[in-house]
Amino acid sequence: MNTFGIQITSIADEINAQVSMHDNTTATVIGVIDTPVKVAGTFSVGTVSTFTADNTGKLTYTGATTTTVQFAASVTLDVVGTNQDLTIQLHKNGIAIPAAKISRTVTSGSAGNVGLFYNIPMTASDYVEIYVANSSSTNDITVTDCLFGVS
């Protein structure tokens, strides 16, 4: 609080959320080639402020103002089969964000990691989740490790 009785806060300092998942063995079932599916597994909820988070990896904005937030994800993928083209993609309110995705070729037993950063405008109750897709086959994808958050 300054000498005039005004408290100045930075909204950037108040917005954060993180979920993580390590050593996951639950496969995400891929029913259709190149169709994103929400990541399967149980996430641990970390520190949150102006967001809520749950053990499915869903981050929900609870702020009173509309703001743009940077989402960051580090995802390690494994799959059955060779040379499988896998994609991670952010979905807002259950709808794919077309540009918020990145792909990598992965072979069984040789897990691959990808990082994704994307700015998303958020209003109260908007939520973001991570989805995966296999554009090579319907082989299931296991997200063995995942860090997902906002800052």
Model-derived segments and spans:
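Terminal (often C-terminal
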Residues: 2-82, 101-102, 117, 138-151
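Terminal beta-strand-rich extracellular "head" domains
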Residues: 70-123, 131-139
